[in-house]
């Protein structure tokens, strides 16, 4: 169904004396738009179905125009590297890219993507997008660099059958990290043969390790990654150390998965399509989108999935106010600076993020919507297998990653620290020291601080 192509502007490779051939190639480029996105298997079949539906209507509305997809099969970290190379080259730059919102500032600062303000100023539909989500696609220069099509929250998924076997309460509402650790220890003791606790823990899972694991812990402490008052990165803090210590407790007490399962780029598929449907994991620290793979017609249909696994809020470290924590991010459609067909790309983005197609996307993929109208749609709120109501309730205490252009490099250092602790190659304190050195190297010693 998908037209898999990395479109090259062949005119640059043609006979330079042939003006007719060059004109033909230029014309062809104006009759097609290319959309690059990360294809990570079963985890985003809903995204593909959404894009395919938009493509069909778009081509009907624009006779003679072809929409071509450029799926990039890669781990998260490799995807960003490949995409960066692609958009920097005029011959390979697509017209639209799916942009993880944490990359907006760095890609904008690098000149890789265009601001969209000139289009938004004439687009009345922009008022229907959540203002907090808009912040995630606005760079430090105050300009908008992407139109969001998803947002999310994170929490703890727990298996009600495993909890009952272990004698743990259902519903489960942990009030502190100690409650979470004690539940995992009880599962290990009372229900052998299952993974007590799962959290992404390796470099191969990229931002999922940084955000879904480490930052879900750190932002439940009294500390953060970045001090917006001083505009400095906090490279050492008690909260940072305690977050790594939590990870150490999981793996040193054999409460986590096998390293061969969690240190691979396929970790997301393993937990969502194998361990959870087989009821082989007790607690999973993950996002609201998980049931998207279990929907009817999805990659791993499991209609009763959200009856077996319930979503509960992640507590703060000691239960301190506000009691719970979450992290929110999302994805957007952006236009590379070296795109061939920017105006037509904008027309596609408008259609793809419209009420009609954003509703289709969230129903297919399981993400939360950035649109105010779709958020109130009864079909979305009451969709079978949906956890929209629960996940949306986490927004009131959620946090966002620092919108600073060095964040992607800092995130890579976080992933290295988490993996080092999970594998036991470094102690939590040693891993924090390694992180401090690496971040200082990346951002400069004048841009870091230690919090006592």
Where are the language model's segments positioned?
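Extracytoplasmic/periplasmic solute-binding protein
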Residues: 141-149, 154, 179-239, 272
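Conserved N-terminal structural module of periplasmic/extracytoplasmic solute-binding proteins
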Residues: 5, 10-112, 121-127, 170, ...
């Amino acid at each position: 169904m998908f037209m898999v192509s990395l479109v090259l502007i062949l005119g640059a490779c043609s006979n330079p004396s042939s003006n007719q051939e060059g004109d033909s190639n230029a014309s062809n480029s104006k009759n097609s738009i290319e959309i690059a996105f990360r294809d990570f298997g079963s985890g985003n079949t809903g995204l593909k179905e959404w894009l395919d539906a938009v493509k069909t209507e778009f081509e009907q509305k624009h006779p003679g125009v072809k929409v071509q997809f450029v799926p990039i099969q890669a781990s998260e970290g490799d995807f960003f590297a490949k995409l960066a190379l692609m958009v920097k080259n005029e011959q390979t730059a697509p017209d639209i890219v799916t942009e993880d919102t944490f990359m907006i500032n760095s890609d904008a600062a690098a000149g890789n993507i265009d601001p969209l303000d000139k289009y938004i100023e004439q687009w009345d539909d922009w008022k229907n997008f959540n203002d907090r989500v808009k912040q995630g696609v606005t760079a430090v220069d105050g300009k908008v660099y992407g139109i969001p099509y998803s947002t999310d929250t994170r929490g703890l998924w727990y298996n009600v059958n495993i909890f009952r076997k272990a004698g743990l309460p259902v519903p489960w509402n942990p009030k502190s990290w100690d409650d979470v650790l004690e539940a995992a220890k009880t599962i290990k003791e009372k229900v052998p043969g299952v993974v007590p606790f799962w959290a992404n823990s390796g470099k191969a899972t990229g931002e999922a390790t940084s955000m879904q694991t480490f930052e879900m812990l750190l932002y439940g402490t009294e500390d953060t990654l970045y001090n917006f008052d001083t505009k400095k990165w906090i490279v050492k803090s008690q909260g940072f150390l305690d977050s790594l210590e939590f990870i150490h407790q999981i793996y040193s007490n054999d409460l986590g998965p096998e390293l061969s399962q969690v240190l691979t780029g396929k970790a997301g598929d393993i937990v969502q399509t194998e361990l959870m449907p087989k009821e082989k994991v007790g607690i999973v620290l993950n996002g609201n989108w998980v049931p998207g793979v279990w929907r009817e017609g999805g990659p791993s249909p499991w209609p009763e999935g959200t009856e077996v696994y319930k979503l509960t809020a992640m507590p703060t470290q000691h239960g301190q106010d506000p009691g719970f924590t979450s992290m929110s991010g999302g994805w957007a459609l952006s236009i590379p600076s070296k795109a061939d067909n920017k105006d037509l790309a904008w027309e596609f983005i408008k259609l793809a993020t419209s009420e009609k197609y954003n509703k289709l996307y969230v129903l297919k993929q399981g993400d939360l919507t950035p649109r105010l109208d779709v958020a109130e749609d009864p079909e979305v709120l009451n969709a079978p297998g949906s956890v929209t109501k629960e996940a949306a309730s986490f927004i009131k205490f959620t946090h966002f990653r620092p919108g600073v252009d060095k964040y992607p490099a800092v995130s890579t250092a976080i992933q290295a620290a988490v993996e080092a602790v999970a594998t036991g190659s470094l102690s939590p304190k040693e891993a924090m020291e390694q992180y401090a050195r690496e971040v200082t190297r990346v951002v400069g010693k004048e841009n870091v601080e230690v919090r006592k």
